[in-house]
Curated annotation (Swiss-Prot):
It comes from Buchnera aphidicola subsp. Schizaphis graminum (strain Sg). NCBIfam families: 1-(5-phosphoribosyl)-5-[(5-phosphoribosylamino)methylideneamino]imidazole-4-carboxamide isomerase. SUPFAM superfamilies: Ribulose-phoshate binding barrel (SSF51366). This is 1-(5-phosphoribosyl)-5-[(5-phosphoribosylamino)methylideneamino] imidazole-4-carboxamide isomerase. It catalyses: 1-(5-phospho-beta-D-ribosyl)-5-[(5-phospho-beta-D-ribosylamino)methylideneamino]imidazole-4-carboxamide = 5-[(5-phospho-1-deoxy-D-ribulos-1-ylimino)methylamino]-1-(5-phospho-beta-D-ribosyl)imidazole-4-carboxamide. The keyword Isomerase applies. It is an enzyme of class 5 (isomerase). One of its GO terms (cellular component) is cytoplasm. Its EC number is 5.3.1.16. The keyword Isomerase applies. Gene3D superfamilies: Aldolase class I (3.20.20.70). GO terms for biological process: L-histidine biosynthetic process; L-tryptophan biosynthetic process. Belongs to the HisA/HisF family. GO terms for molecular function: 1-(5-phosphoribosyl)-5-[(5-phosphoribosylamino)methylideneamino]imidazole-4-carboxamide isomerase activity.
Length: 244
């Protein structure tokens, strides 16, 4: 599945370079027109990130997301500093279909385990952002400001017994760079964890990247910058993914 992504600050579409808030690009794009176009073209899911909420929970863009969700019929998954059940309930009550949990899955594993039981594996997506160090897939947290000694494999193995199903995996070195995805990484983790539905994120810049990612076995690809900068059209991306 092709999943277009929009990162939002104060209701505006932005892209961070390698997760850096001080190195960002603002896009003069009408989000509502874009969503309407995507709905007509057959997009099945949208990925939204609340960058304000990720920095400070008091700055959540609740009105923005309420407006978006009431406007479009495309199912929404959302992330950005989700740290408690109040956040999850608030987003689900707005109409969000899936919530993306990042740092909490590392810092508060017991709590996230409980969420998987309460809400079910089809609602919770774990976002595992990794840095490759000495062939280890080390997880970074808190907007990639802090690296851990915990590997992606350890986290998936920890949550799998209670039904973990969805993982969004980003190679930080690729995010927002248009330098091509890390196909070796995705091929490896898909082979290791056949029960997980992986979403790949980072580095896609051309249609060839989508074809190569599909061959790795990932179920979905999140695309941000390359669609925002018209490297290819949504029609081309959807056709490309379906054609293989």
């Amino acid at each position: 599945m092709i999943i277009p992504a929009f990162d939002l600050i104060n209701g505006e579409i932005v892209r961070l370079y390698k997760g850096n808030f001080f190195n960002r690009t603002k896009y003069d794009i009408n989000l509502y027109k874009r969503l309407k176009d995507y709905e007509i073209k057959g997009v099945k899911k949208i990925h939204l990130v609340d960058l304000d909420g990720a920095k400070n929970i008091k700055d959540r863009q609740i009105k923005v997301f309420r407006d978006i969700i009431s406007y479009t019929n495309i199912p929404i998954q959302i992330g950005g500093g989700i740290r408690n059940e109040e956040d999850i309930n608030m987003f689900l009550n707005l109409g969000v279909k899936k919530v993306v949990i990042g740092s909490s899955a590392i810092k508060n594993k017991t709590k996230v385990k409980k969420w998987l039981k309460i809400y079910g594996p089809n609602v919770i997506i774990l976002a595992l952002d990794i840095i490759i160090k000495n062939n280890n897939k080390e997880i970074a947290i808190h907007g990639w400001q802090e690296t851990t000694n915990i590997t992606l494999e350890e986290i998936i193995e920890y949550f799998s017994p209670i039904g973990l199903k969805h993982v969004l995996c980003t190679d930080i070195s690729k995010d927002g760079t248009l330098s091509g995805p890390n196909n070796i990484l995705y091929k490896d983790i898909v082979k290791k964890f056949k029960h997980i539905s992986f979403q790949a994120s980072g580095g896609v810049s051309r249609l060839k990247d989508l074809l190569s990612l599909k061959k790795t076995g990932v179920k979905s690809v999140i695309i941000g910058r390359s669609l925002l900068e018209n490297k290819f059209t949504i029609e081309e991306a959807l056709k490309c993914w379906q054609s293989e």
